[in-house]
Amino acid sequence: DVVPDIVVMGKPIGNGHPLAAVVVTNEIAEAFNNGLEYFNTFGGNPVSMAAGLAVLDVIETEKMQQHAFETGNYLMNGLRMLMNKFPIIGDVRGYGLFIGAELVRSRETLEPAVPEIDIVVEQMKDRGFLVSTDGPLHNVLKIKPPMVFSKENAAALITNLDAILSEL
């Protein structure tokens, strides 16, 4: 297991309220305990801390991590079924609700299917699903839905992606 020395978090941890955090090991934190007082205008702001705590409470009480894990697995299984049906899907990977499906013109050469993925992204948008491209070759279909995304939503995404890929 790898334990990071420093973790920087931001954006979603305040659920719309501007909030960021830097979490460090005790050893690194002790380096700041040198007699000089560290000052930050917004550091430890009570409103921000309350917002962050509320977000953590909701994540825990509503079992959002478990939901993301279960819904993500459901979605990945559906994408893998599509991978068995469509050779254009060269790989499916991810964790929770952060998933990628790599589109290739050939599984042997792994040539990126960039024009095809652009069509898929636009047609998914037309059908009400916001997905995008990622990866150094821009051929990975990035699926990163909000936490409220359900298994029913995932099933609809798979059904629509199946229809689009059938038409390519």
Q: Predicted regions span which residues?
A:
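Conserved N-terminal phosphate-binding loop of PLP-dependent enzymes in the Aspartate aminotransferase
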Residues: D1-L168
